[in-house]
Amino acid sequence: MTKQLRSIIGILFVGLLMFPAIVKADGGGVSLKGNFQSDALVGQLDSVIGATGYNGPFVSNSYLDLSLASQYVTAGARLELLHCPLPGFEDAFAGGGLPNIYVTGKYKWFEATIGNVYDQFGSGFIFRAYEDRPLGVDNSLRGARFVFTPYKGIRLKALGGMQRKYFNYGMNNAFGFDYSQGAVMGADLELNVSEWSKVMQEGGYNLLFGASYVSKYDPDEVIQPSPLYKLNLPQFVGAGDVRVRFQKGGWNALVEYAYKANDPSADNGYIYKPGQAAMLSLAYSQRGMSFLVQAKRSENMSFRSDRTGSGIGGFINHMPAFSMTHTYALAAMYPYATQYGTPKARGEWAFQAEARYTFKRKTPMGGKYGTSFRLNGTYIRGIKANPLETNITGTLQGTNGYTSPFFGFGDETYYLDVHLEFSKKITKTFSMTALYMFQQYNQAVVEGHGWNAAEEGYWFKGSKTADIANSHIGIVELKYKPSKNIGMRGELQYLFTRQDRGQWVYALYEISLFQQAMIEISDLYNADATKQHYYKVAASYNWGTHRVQLSYGRTRAGYNCSGGVCRYVPASKGLALSYSVSF
């Protein structure tokens, strides 16, 4: 980083820290809000688990968010310091500066934002700009957004800008703020019909129609499947979305459809077939009971600001996951990543259903304190894709790629998850949760490989190549709270599979003191392939809005996932320190 940039960041950092005093002295109708977060690791080499290198002896991700708000205007900025980022964050993350800054003005039915904006149209099929720090996702647009609410029940949004791509220092980019080479623009209209009907309001009905359009501009470039010809690439690619949501009492129904024009890219192998996505969701909820059923079909819906992009950065859209995000360690060992459309997986059919029921207290099943059950099932399968004839180079580049009947299912299961969870409070101080899960996980599709039994070092020698890992998982969690100031929690988990690395066992013990301090000891053990322990000791303390955590131990290599988006995180070992504060 240049000396000039260090000086500018230092001045801005000091100036931002002085804002509280300035606001307090002003005494006007201006308020300051902010938060600071820093995650650091002093890494140690451990070749046994694959922790063979870090970005430096001390690696950290630090963020400072500040916003000043008055009655009509809000201004904010975020300082990021990621010069030596944590394991799992690629080189594009390395850097520091103020990549996020904005000013928003509101008056009556109009709102305008200049700077970096985050937003989402509908379910995100064609547009979602958001931040997820643990995943390393920040695809905000630097540009402008306008929101109009001219009449009750009507909201119109229009926005445009260049998409963020983290940091990239160079001769022509001294500040390191890197953005897409093209631009993204779009509009979203929502009509809440219930706001116009007194009958619907009195009956408790809510009916909403939505429509969106997004277009990206990506400058032309030379991509040649062979020396004989180059691809004629569209510089403007449009996508549209329509949706209807209906609510009545505990009922909630959603139907949504999106269409994307032909968008040849590195993701889809530079084919010209349009993309589409359709979703149906029905849910019901009342006290003590709820259920949810969902179905989604999507194909060729990778939509990036740069057609040659890769990894999890640069997406304009977000395809919502139909697999549950598990919090237990072994249940989350094989997380599913949504398939946007690649030559290996052109799309997916996804189904999810869930039912919850709580037996009332003082009933045969409920007992003295009540009993809760939750049954959840997810099934995701590929779409049927019939390849077209290849071009003169023997590939599908420059063609429509394939045909696919809408209701056609492919030959491969991508993911299956069925689990039953039981929760019961046994006494005033003691409660338990038990869970059983059966899971099928297609490693060849999700991770790009299957584990080959013929390779040296794998525990199941002699068996066939395993693209799908079949797992049986059992979990028991116990909670004991003998007093107001003391609480204890323990977990015992077991995962059985004959594929991948074989069986795993996980145990955790946690004690909380005075609702402020917590000490945790855990160990993850692989009983077959590696026979390695991944131990960890952690302590945390909360004081007001301050939180600090210190831990030491091993972390296995694996995938960190949220909402169907996954990032590979390599193995690590060392002393980790996290601190956060809000004000």
Residue ranges: model-predicted function:
Residues 10-20:
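Bacterial N-terminal signal peptides
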Residues 2-9:
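Bacterial N-terminal signal peptides that target proteins for export
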Residues 131-134, 171-179, 230-231:
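Flexible, glycine/proline-enriched loop segments at strand-loop-helix junctions
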Residues 128-132, 172-174, 267-270, 277:
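Short helix/strand-bridging catalytic loops that position acidic/His residues to coordinate divalent metals
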Residues 23-119, 125-127, 140-160, 180-198, ...:
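Beta-barrel outer-membrane channel/assembly domains of diderm bacteria
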Residues 37, 59, 197-204, 209-213, ...:
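Exposed, low-structure sequence patches enriched in small/polar residues
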Residues 43, 121-124, 166-167, 219-222, ...:
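Short acidic/His/Gly/Ser-rich catalytic and metal-binding motifs that mark active-site loops
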Residues 125-126, 168-172, 221-225, 256:
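A short secondary-structure junction signal
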